[in-house]
Regions:
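Bacterial Sec-dependent N-terminal signal peptides
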Residues: 1-39
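Short non-domain terminal segments
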Residues: 5, 13, 19-21, 63, ...
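Primarily the internal scaffold of c-type cytochrome electron-transfer domains
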Residues: 33-36, 45, 52, 60-129, ...
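Secretory-pathway extracellular proteins and peptide precursors enriched for disulfide-bonded cysteines
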Residues: 18-24, 45-46, 173, 206, ...
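Propeptide (latency) domains of metzincin metalloproteases
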Residues: 138, 144-146, 150-177, 183, ...
């Protein structure tokens, strides 16, 4: 009996020692992982070369890409980049007779200045322009290391200053900008105080790469540039990502990062890089119904509900979009890509073409991806002139009878 008790005690002791050993190993590994993650985060900015570094080997692509809306979706605010007018008579937004904001140019920069009951009461410098200007722009201001959205934006469709979307009929200079906002308008922004701290996120002003550059799709390129510069005769690239070789899912995940609607972070912004699985970084709503999806920012979810997409094994965003070129508004070009699948050989050619006009074959888009009013980009006009919603093309490819009817009426003699 004594031997049995001693054996049990020895077994228990061995078990406890073994468990403690594995626990300590796990703690050490976790500590190493956390330290490695911290080091990677601290070194992240150094891993980027900037898009200009790509030009020496890829000049034609670079020269084309810098004209795209992606590349110009954020810029340091200056006279060239701010789309709105600072001319007297064109630089004021009136909320009501007693309250307005004027856009002012001074020797120290550009400012939005609140005037209440005849006195300037608040001002903030315009530091960053968000948006290429094709649809419009909104503006950010630094306050220390914090970023805030300014109350007045610019809307290209009305060629005028407007109240920033979602703002009330009063001036607001205190809407904070977090890293997730910047993740879809910059290539990289270094966070120096995370939202996880319970305080507003802060950023390093000197470690922001403006615009969606080459490295958003091809991954951080500093190591690639260093290697290629030292090995100029090598034709097989190293240390760079080629999205053209991605699986369908990885290709879609890359675009979905910013065109996939609202997602919840489970890892810090900017840790997702090209080639990663989106589900490892975000909580994704896979059940969103198309009736609830806005045309702005939900391109993936709308496309995913389209018959074209659901019946294709290969269709991705790049089936229709060439990210290197500024193709926006080129209806004929996009229609040609539609007809790569929808043609007489496949028996899927548009029946309207055969019965009406030949010119419709150059425009599939207006009937099957019509412009619709955004519920998110709704802006208040100055002087109480009401509100305007921006028109954007839906990515839910379908048959829209009303849009088709309007198109046929408009083009009946063509």
């Amino acid at each position: 009996m004594t031997r049995i008790l001693k054996f049990k005690r020895s077994s228990l002791l061995i078990f406890l020692i073994t468990s403690l050993f594995f626990f300590l190993i796990q703690c050490i590994n976790n500590g190493a992982d956390k330290k490695e993650a911290l080091n990677n985060e601290n070194d992240a900015f150094q891993q980027y070369a900037g898009s200009k570094a790509c030009a020496s080997c890829h000049k034609n692509i670079y020269d084309s890409f810098i004209k795209t809306n992606h590349f110009t979706t954020s810029q340091i605010a200056d006279a060239e980049n701010i789309k709105g007018s600072f001319e007297k008579g064109k630089n004021v937004f009136h909320y009501n007779p007693a309250l307005f904001v004027s856009m002012q140019k001074t020797d120290s920069g550009f400012y939005e200045v609140e005037n209440s009951h005849g006195s300037d009461t608040l001002s903030a410098r315009t530091d960053i322009a968000i948006g290429s200007g094709t649809i419009g722009q909104t503006y950010l201001s630094w306050k220390g290391n914090n970023l805030f959205q300014l109350p007045i934006s610019y809307l290209s469709s009305v060629h005028d200053w407007v109240n920033s979307p979602g703002y009330s009929d009063q001036t607001i200079f205190s809407r904070p900008i977090n890293a997730r906002c910047l993740e879809c308008h910059t290539t990289y922004a270094k966070s120096i105080q995370s939202e996880l701290s319970g305080q507003q996120e802060q950023f390093d002003k000197q470690k922001i790469i403006y615009g969606i550059g080459c490295e958003r799709c091809h991954g951080p390129g500093a190591k690639h540039v260093e290697w290629q510069t030292g090995n100029p005769k090598e034709t097989i690239p190293k240390y760079i990502v080629n999205p053209g070789k991605f699986s369908k899912k990885l290709s879609l995940d890359l675009c979905r990062l910013c065109h996939g609607g609202k997602m919840g972070n489970i890892k810090p912004a900017f840790t997702f890089t090209s080639g990663d699985k989106l589900q490892d970084y975000f909580i994704i709503d896979e059940l969103a119904h198309t009736s609830n999806l806005d045309v702005h920012g939900n391109q993936f979810s709308l496309l995913a509900n389209s018959k074209c997409f659901r019946t294709s094994k290969t269709m991705t965003c790049v089936t229709c979009h060439n990210a290197h070129d500024n193709e926006r508004g080129d209806v004929a070009l996009f229609s040609q890509r539609c007809m790569a699948c929808h043609n007489k050989e496949h028996g899927t050619f548009c029946t309207t073409v055969a019965t009406t006009m030949s010119s419709i074959s150059a425009n599939c888009i207006d009937c099957h991806m019509p412009q619709m009013a955004s519920k998110k980009i709704v802006s208040q006009l100055s002087d109480g002139r009401g509100f305007t919603a921006e028109l954007l093309r839906t990515h839910l490819i379908a048959v829209y009878p009303e849009a088709t009817k309007n198109f046929l009426l408009k083009n009946k003699n063509k």
